[in-house]
Amino acid sequence: MKVLEDLYYSKDHVWVKVEGDKAYIGITDYAQDSLGDAEYIELPEVGTEFTAGDVLGVIESAKAASDVYIPVDGEVIEVNNAVAEDPSLVNSDPYGSWLVAVRLKDKAQVEKLMKAEEYKKFLET
């Protein structure tokens, strides 16, 4: 499984990339591999506010429908429509195919997420 060094990871197999007070959020290589071929992705609208642990969206595959849990508090400021229109992008490029961008409410929450090495160890358990 591919794990990128410059991202933060949740136990729900969601990655977070921080740029200033903005965070891009997507699913990990492990998550997309477990789900199988994504067929449909339901994403929130711009302006939607979330608290860490809320369901951000749903990814449906032939195997299952899986909730995507947001690991930080924030307001959606951008939605990746390309992924909504072509869900297979999360399979072919899970780290390049972010789902949403949020304005972070508390950057300290990101520091509580796993860094790459911790996430790799988590995957081994």
UniProtKB/Swiss-Prot annotation:
GO terms for cellular component: cytoplasm; glycine cleavage complex. Keywords: Lipoyl. Binds 1 lipoyl cofactor covalently. The modification N6-lipoyllysine is found at K63. The keyword Transport does not apply. Residues 22-103 form the Lipoyl-binding domain. It comes from the Bacteria. One of its GO terms (biological process) is glycine decarboxylation via glycine cleavage system. Its cofactor is (R)-lipoate. InterPro entries: 2-oxoA_DH_lipoyl-BS, Biotin_lipoyl, GCV_H, GCV_H/Fam206, GCV_H_sub, Single_hybrid_motif. Belongs to the GcvH family. The glycine cleavage system is composed of four proteins: P, T, L and H. This is Glycine cleavage system H protein 1. It comes from Caldanaerobacter subterraneus subsp. tengcongensis (strain DSM 15242 / JCM 11007 / NBRC 100824 / MB4) (Thermoanaerobacter tengcongensis).
